């Protein structure tokens, strides 16, 4: 507790103990010790007896004086750190640290020593090692000091960052499995700036500060984890961290990260949920501006584009462009804006392969995607439009057409074999579901059972699909619709994929009251957890069981229905309609 006081020539408890051990008159010895080590103010001596009269212990008085002086000293240290020339103030702080460092383990004076170190841009290495070696001191020191320790100790920095990265991934996954189902409030609803205010991003931003070396370390951790897990949320964090530093005008880092301006432009697109022509040209300029010998930057750009928020924006923009092309009667290959969106999508989707192979080349786009798949997708839009127009015609002008209920075999094959085709196809499914287009949805569902990399059963797609299906709530009363959706799609994967099981239960928790009773009973049996099911599935299933019980209690029993007397009410007379 009194460590370091002797080094400064200040008497401590050990000195008092020694004095009392060797003295013959203890009271005189104590009085002398108090005189020598008390507050040496002549005016104070006459005032102390008043404190005694009020029963104020000397310890309380001295502690109060000590706290006041320590606060003044902390203010003075902060003032020194901001006064005069840099060289002079750092010299003063170094001298102060040299004199006070021996007190660093004394709890009452530790804040002063830590404050001095905090304001030094370069703490002597010897002292940093002493701090690092002592867990208590390391925990107590300011982040400014820790940065100096971390930049030469990647493993220690990794230990600090790792729990934050785990927390971030858990938060993202938790958001995808949110019990709230809504087309308006979903995973992609928060604006980029709002997302950057999250705890993990803010903590990482503070830990990095203006230190380029630490920033590079975080990026390396994110690349490594992305390669190890294929988890795209690490790509989101990479973009969010850079933009968080951008918000704080940390030019030391923003000017050296070659992805800064590209990310800034893309961030604006994500905010608007659309890539307009002007920004599309800017993004193209960054890609075209990658010089020979600097191709490695494509790895980072692809990671920025692999961020689900970027993929979502690019995919939504692609669907919008395709609709415009239909109305303009233009082919996909004749639209430079569409081709650029596809180029950006391809780079984002190829991020893992690009970084893993270390072959930094833009992935080749399949010609058939543009010449066959997209025109085929546009033909589905035309089928839909034609049918809707026909339904609005007077009865005598209507053609006897039924809505097409099959997909071209080649269309399904594209969804299975090409990632780009699959991504665009899935976003078209989301688009028609949001449009409450039941016919188009039922036509496309069989094609989603087998898709490239099971993308139709990915958490992001299922999160968006279940949210959009809320708009078709009335259709769940129809057994045919439920059979197509559940038996024909969801239940083909739920036994082997726990995430699908969870998403189906989320959907039923929200819409159970709308589902046809016979179908609901069958679904409850089909979705019963097995011994291998995780806690999340069991919990959701239990909640569904409770909801269904409440639903049963609300319904009148057959006997109650029979006992309820019918009310014989006279029919009101209705006037005959006037002849037209």
Swiss-Prot record:
MF GO annotations: RNA binding
UniProt region (Disordered), positions on chain: 552-580
Subunit (UniProt): The NELF complex is composed of NELFA, NELFB, NELFCD and NELFE; the N-terminus of NELFB binds to the NELFA:NELFCD subcomplex. Binds RNA which may help to stabilize the NELF complex on nucleic acid Interacts with the first BRCT repeat of BRCA1. Interacts with KIAA1191. Isoform 1 and isoform 2 interact with NELFA, NELFCD and NELFE.
A Pfam family: COBRA1
Known tissue expression: Isoform 1 is expressed in the kidney, liver, adipose and lung. Isoform 2 is widely expressed.
GO biological process: cell population proliferation; negative regulation of stem cell differentiation; negative regulation of transcription elongation by RNA polymerase II; stem cell differentiation
Organism superkingdom: Eukaryota
Protein family membership: Belongs to the NELF-B family.
Null allele phenotype: Mice exhibit early embryonic lethality. Knockdown in embryonic stem cells (ESCs) leads to proliferation defects, increased differentiation, increased expression of development-associated genes and the dysregulation of genes involved in signaling and metabolic pathways. Mice exhibit cardiomyopathy, impaired response to cardiac stress and the reduced expression of metabolism-related genes in cardiomyocytes.
Assigned keywords, A-Z: Acetylation, Nucleus, Phosphoprotein, Repressor, RNA-binding, Transcription, Transcription regulation
Residue positions where N6-acetyllysine is found in the record: 519
Gene that this polypeptide is encoded by: Nelfb
UniProt keyword Phosphoprotein present: yes
Function: Essential component of the NELF complex, a complex that negatively regulates the elongation of transcription by RNA polymerase II (Pol II). The NELF complex, which acts via an association with the DSIF complex and causes transcriptional pausing, is counteracted by the P-TEFb kinase complex. May be able to induce chromatin unfolding. Essential for early embryogenesis; plays an important role in maintaining the undifferentiated state of embryonic stem cells (ESCs) by preventing unscheduled expression of developmental genes.
Protein name as annotated: Negative elongation factor B
One CC-aspect GO term: mitochondrial outer membrane
Disulfide bonds, paired cysteine numbers: none
Modified residues (Phosphoserine): 557
Cell location: Nucleus
Taxonomy of the source species: Eukaryota, Metazoa, Chordata, Craniata, Vertebrata
Database matches in InterPro entries: COBRA1 (IPR010405)
């Amino acid at each position: 507790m009194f460590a370091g006081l002797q080094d400064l020539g200040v008497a401590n408890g050990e000195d008092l103990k020694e004095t009392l051990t060797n003295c013959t008159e203890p009271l005189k010895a104590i009085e002398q010790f108090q005189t020598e080590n008390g507050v040496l103010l002549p005016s104070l001596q006459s005032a102390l007896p008043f404190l005694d009269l009020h029963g104020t212990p000397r310890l309380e008085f001295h502690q109060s004086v000590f706290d006041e002086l320590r606060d003044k000293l902390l203010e003075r240290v902060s003032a020194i750190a901001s006064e005069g020339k840099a060289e002079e103030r750092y010299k003063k702080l170094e001298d102060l640290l040299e004199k006070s460092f021996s007190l660093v383990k004394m709890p009452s004076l530790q804040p002063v020593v830590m404050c001095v170190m905090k304001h030094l841009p370069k703490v002597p290495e010897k002292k940093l090692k002493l701090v690092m070696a002592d867990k208590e001191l390391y925990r107590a020191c300011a982040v400014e000091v820790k940065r100096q320790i971390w930049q030469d100790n990647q493993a220690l920095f990794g230990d600090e960052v790792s729990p934050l990265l785990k927390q971030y991934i858990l938060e993202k996954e938790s958001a995808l499995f949110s019990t709230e189902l809504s087309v308006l409030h979903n995973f992609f609803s928060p604006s980029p700036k709002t997302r950057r205010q999250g705890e993990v991003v803010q903590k990482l931003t503070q830990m990095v500060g203006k230190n380029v070396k630490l920033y590079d370390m975080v990026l390396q951790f994110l690349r490594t984890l992305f390669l190890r897990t294929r988890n795209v949320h690490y790509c989101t964090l990479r973009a969010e961290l850079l933009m968080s530093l951008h918000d704080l005008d940390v030019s030391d880092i923003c000017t050296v990260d070659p992805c800064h301006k590209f990310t800034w432009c893309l961030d604006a697109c994500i905010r608007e949920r659309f890539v307009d022509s002007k920004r599309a040209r800017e993004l193209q300029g960054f890609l075209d501006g990658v010089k020979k010998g600097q191709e490695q930057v494509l790895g980072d750009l692809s990671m920025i584009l692999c961020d689900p928020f970027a993929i979502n924006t690019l995919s939504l923009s692609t669907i919008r462009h395709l609709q415009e092309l239909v109305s303009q009667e233009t082919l996909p290959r004749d639209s430079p804006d569409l081709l650029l969106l596809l180029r950006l999508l391809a780079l984002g989707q190829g991020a893992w392969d690009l970084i893993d192979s270390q072959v930094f080349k833009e992935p080749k786009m399949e010609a058939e995607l543009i010449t066959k798949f997209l025109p085929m997708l546009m033909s589905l839009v035309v089928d839909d439009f034609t049918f809707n127009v026909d339904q609005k015609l007077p009865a005598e002008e209507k053609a006897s057409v039924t809505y097409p209920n099959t997909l071209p075999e080649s269309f399904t094959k594209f969804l299975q074999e090409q990632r780009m085709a699959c991504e665009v196809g899935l976003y078209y499914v989301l688009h028609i579901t949001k449009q409450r287009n039941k016919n188009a949805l039922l036509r496309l569902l069989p094609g989603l059972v087998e898709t490239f990399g099971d993308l139709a059963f990915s958490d992001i797609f299922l999160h968006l699909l279940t949210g959009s299906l809320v708009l078709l709530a009335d259709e769940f009363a129809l057994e045919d619709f439920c059979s197509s959706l559940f038996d024909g799609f969801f239940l083909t994967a739920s036994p082997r994929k726990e995430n699908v099981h969870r998403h189906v239960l989320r959907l039923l928790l929200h819409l159970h009251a709308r589902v046809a009773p016979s179908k609901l009973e069958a679904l409850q049996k089909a979705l019963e957890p097995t011994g291998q099911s995780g806690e999340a599935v069991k919990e959701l299933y239990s909640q569904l069981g409770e909801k269904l019980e409440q639903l049963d209690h609300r319904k009148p029993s057959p006997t109650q229905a029979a006992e309820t007397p019918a009310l014989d009410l006279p029919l009101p007379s209705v006037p005959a309609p006037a002849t037209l």
